[in-house]
């Protein structure tokens, strides 16, 4: 009987790294592979990965951005320690391949894999490559990317996303029977985006007879943002305010348009369902979210509003100049940019390059 192949996944820190990696892991599990995970104890993967039935091991590593001089001076020691911890785990687990999908854990894990002779397959989720992935690309056996701008010669495969997003009805079917108020979904991510939470209620007050709104405000913000809607005179039966949304596929499919940040996973989830967006990119020196948003905006599937330019006037102007015919055209373009076989393609590359 042939021995089962094993993949070590290195991904952590944010949902943008962890969820695409889970999608690939689940695909390979169906192909008979064993999966183990390398993460850190204090980030989201520590709770999330075991919930999906995947065993996880931990190394000690954290980012250096914003740290003091003491942390910077100790960084070489901390990195060497993390590499040795990862090497010990790799020698014990004996994976046939390692998949790096971002987060602090990927750096030491990738170096340790190279030292152990295990092939490293890298996937960059964003339109701009993170520093860790830039370094790892020099030792990786294969480099894959979601968008065509991160690496000059890497294969573009899209971002692996949950399959339930692709099972939603196509835009033509969803929009066919829609009449009445435009459906606006506001999503700030798991933490809520403060700028959206503070701007949208004022916009809603000026379009109360034109919009139906679902607003996900993040943990601990429902009471405050509900009060803000009430203060602006925008609170009504057509406004639903929640901390979190459990079924994002259904929420995206319900919406005529989404107002949100433009993390890589969000952009690819919207494309998977085929839902237009108004993106408000998070401000970052490398313009990562802006370039993610351009992937859909450049084909007419989304609008971009820079955070410095965001106010109620801008949102009112955008929404009053969009009708369902235009929104359907945007939705169709978004769907055309989706990558339904991203998880499968990443898995195929792993299988092709495994020891």
Curated annotation (Swiss-Prot):
Residues forming coiled coils: none
Any GO BP: cell wall organization
Known EC number: 2.4.1.227
CDD domains reported for this sequence: GT28_MurG (cd03785)
Positions annotated to bind UDP-N-acetyl-alpha-D-glucosamine: 14-16, 126, 162, 190, 245, 264-269, 289
Subcellular location: Cell inner membrane
General function of this protein: Cell wall formation. Catalyzes the transfer of a GlcNAc subunit on undecaprenyl-pyrophosphoryl-MurNAc-pentapeptide (lipid intermediate I) to form undecaprenyl-pyrophosphoryl-MurNAc-(pentapeptide)GlcNAc (lipid intermediate II).
Stated name of the protein: UDP-N-acetylglucosamine--N-acetylmuramyl-(pentapeptide) pyrophosphoryl-undecaprenol N-acetylglucosamine transferase
Record organism: Mannheimia succiniciproducens (strain KCTC 0769BP / MBEL55E)
Species classification: Bacteria, Pseudomonadati, Pseudomonadota, Gammaproteobacteria, Pasteurellales
């Amino acid at each position: 009987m042939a021995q089962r192949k094993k993949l070590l996944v290195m991904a952590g820190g944010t949902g943008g790294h962890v969820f695409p990696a889970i999608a690939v892991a689940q695909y390979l599990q169906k192909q008979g592979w064993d999966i183990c995970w390398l993460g850190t104890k204090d980030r989201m993967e520590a709770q999330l990965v075991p919930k999906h039935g995947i065993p996880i091991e931990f190394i000690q590593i954290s980012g250096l951005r914003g740290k003091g001089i003491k942390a910077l001076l100790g960084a070489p020691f901390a990195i060497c320690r993390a590499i040795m911890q990862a090497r010990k785990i790799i020698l014990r687990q004996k994976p046939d391949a390692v998949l790096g999908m971002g987060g602090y854990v990927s750096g030491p894990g990738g170096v340790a894999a190279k030292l152990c002779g295990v092939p490293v397959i890298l996937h960059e989720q964003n339109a701009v490559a993170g520093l860790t992935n830039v370094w790892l690309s020099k030792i990786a056996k294969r480099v894959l990317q979601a968008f065509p701008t991160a690496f000059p010669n890497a294969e573009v495969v899209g971002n692996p996303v949950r399959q339930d997003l692709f099972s939603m009805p196509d835009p033509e079917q969803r929009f066919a029977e829609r009449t009445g108020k435009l459906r606006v979904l506001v999503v700030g991510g798991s933490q809520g985006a403060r700028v959206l939470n503070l701007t949208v209620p004022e916009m809603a007050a000026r379009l109360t007879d034109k919009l139906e709104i679902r607003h996900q405000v993040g943990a601990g913000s429902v009471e405050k943002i509900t009060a803000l809607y009430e203060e602006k005179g925008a609170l009504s039966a057509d406004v639903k305010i929640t901390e979190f949304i459990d079924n994002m596929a259904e929420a995206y499919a319900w919406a005529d348009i989404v107002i949100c940040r433009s993390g890589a996973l969000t952009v690819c989830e919207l494309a998977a369902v085929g839902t237009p967006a108004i993106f408000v990119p998070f401000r970052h020196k490398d313009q990562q979210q802006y370039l993610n948003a351009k992937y859909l905006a450049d084909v007419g599937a989304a609008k971009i509003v820079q955070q410095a330019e965001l106010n109620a006037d801008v949102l009112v102007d955008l929404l009053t100049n969009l009708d369902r015919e235009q929104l359907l055209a945007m939705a169709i373009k978004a769907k055309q940019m989706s990558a339904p076989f991203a998880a499968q393609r990443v898995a195929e590359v792993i299988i092709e390059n495994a020891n």
